Swiss-Prot record:
Residues engaged in binding Mn(2+) 1: 117-118
MF terms in GO: metal ion binding; protein serine/threonine phosphatase activity
Record organism: Arabidopsis thaliana
Annotated ranges, domain PPM-type phosphatase: 77-360
Catalytic reaction annotation: O-phospho-L-seryl-[protein] + H2O = L-seryl-[protein] + phosphate; O-phospho-L-threonyl-[protein] + H2O = L-threonyl-[protein] + phosphate
Cofactor, free-text remark: Binds 2 magnesium or manganese ions per subunit.
Cofactor dependence: Mg(2+); Mn(2+)
UniProt name for this protein: Probable protein phosphatase 2C 24
Length: 362
């Protein structure tokens, strides 16, 4: 994954021209691209292993005719961009796991995508990136056609993730972590989680917090999640019913602290802040793409604009060719994700911005 880090050039950094002018002596932004080799290697290896497993599961007698079948079992194209933006620290995390699970009664794999927006520190978001897809995989049953089964699976996975984070937090504090200044350590650390499991015929989205999933269908946005804000009427009733309060402090906050009503972690705000996700199951039709992103994007870019940008990039990139390597992240999706993060920064987003664009065209 290429991460664009936002940093500040000080007087100690060399400048090309006009160093002495007042306008150029001020602190100014500079963008630096950093390639995460481990991310690239892990993604490529996981895709190659998944493809090898999928191919080996096909009976030998039918392998020769596999390319002539009309069913596309390849992993969907995707693009990822994660930027630090104007924040001092990067607290977002992204998880991409193509073909992370194959139901026993089907040869077609399922694909996992997730965006986690941490707050207080990066511990919980990082832990979700490492563990949540594994918990979902463990909770999946052989037959997931029933919507209630999907909802139960996601709810159990998020609950297990939350319990892991609470019990695991005490052991992750390091000398360089700002959690050192908190007592008890990491109790005020949490993360949003918006994840999607894509099957050949369904799009399953589970959301906890104010990250968002938006489907672009026939050029129009279809929100697949609803932000969990403390002033949302049903969330306000739930918080007050549990004995909590929503206090306005530059925006509605739970007990005047947290600007979202659901999250993984945040042990000190329980039970007012819930880890229970809202789950939607959508049948795949004439879909263009799915966008998962943290609120660093959605705070300044509307659903309509995001879909227009992504669709424009996808239409310019064309469709996957028969001889194209499906294990390579698609250039058009990557361009869409990068363009969306640049747009968010151009509109003065003050948060980390993480965007995943998944091509759903058949």
């Amino acid at each position: 994954m290429a991460e664009i880090c936002y940093e500040v050039v000080t007087d100690a950094c060399p400048s090309s021209v006009y160093e002495s002018t007042p306008a150029h002596s001020r602190r100014r932004p500079r963008f630096q691209t950093v390639m995460h080799e481990d991310w690239e290697k892990n993604c490529k290896r996981s895709k190659q292993e998944a493809l090898a497993t999928r191919y080996s599961s096909i009976p030998r007698s039918s392998r020769e005719d596999f390319s002539d079948q009309n069913v596309d079992v390849s992993s969907p194209r995707y693009g990822v961009s994660s930027v630090c933006g104007r924040r001092r620290e990067m607290e977002d995390a992204v998880a991409i796991h193509p073909s992370f699970s194959s139901p026993k009664n089907s040869e077609f794999p399922q694909h996992y995508f997730g965006v986690y927006d941490g707050h207080g520190c990066s511990h919980v978001a990082a832990r979700c990136r490492e563990r949540l897809h594994k918990l979902v995989q463990e909770e999946l049953s052989s037959d997931m056609e029933d919507e209630e089964e999907w909802k139960t699976t996601m709810e159990r996975s998020f609950t297990r993730m939350d319990k892991e984070v609470v019990s695991w937090g005490d052991s992750v504090v390091t000398a360089n972590c700002k959690c050192d200044l908190q007592t008890p350590a990491c109790d005020s650390v949490g993360s949003t989680a918006v994840v999607s499991v894509i099957t050949p015929d369904k799009i399953v989205v589970a959301n906890c917090g104010d990250s968002r999933a938006v489907l672009c269908r026939n050029g129009k946005p279809v929100p697949l999640s609803t932000d969990h804000k403390p002033d949302r009427p049903d969330e306000l009733d739930r918080i007050e019913g549990a004995g909590g309060r929503v206090i306005y402090w530059d925006c509605p906050r739970v007990l005047g602290v947290l600007a979202m009503s659901r999250a993984i972690g945040d042990n000190y705000l329980k039970p007012y802040v819930s880890c229970e996700p809202e789950v939607t199951i959508t049948d795949r039709r004439d879909d263009d793409c799915l966008i998962l992103a943290s609120d660093g994007l959605w705070d300044v870019v509307s659903n309509e604009t995001a879909c227009s940008v992504a669709r424009m990039c996808l239409r310019g990139g064309g469709r996957r060719q028969d001889n194209e390597d499906p294990a390579i992240s698609d250039k058009a999706c990557t361009e869409a994700s990068v363009l969306l993060t640049k747009l968010a920064l151009a509109r003065n987003s003050s948060d980390n911005v993480s965007v995943v664009v998944i091509d759903l065209r058949r």
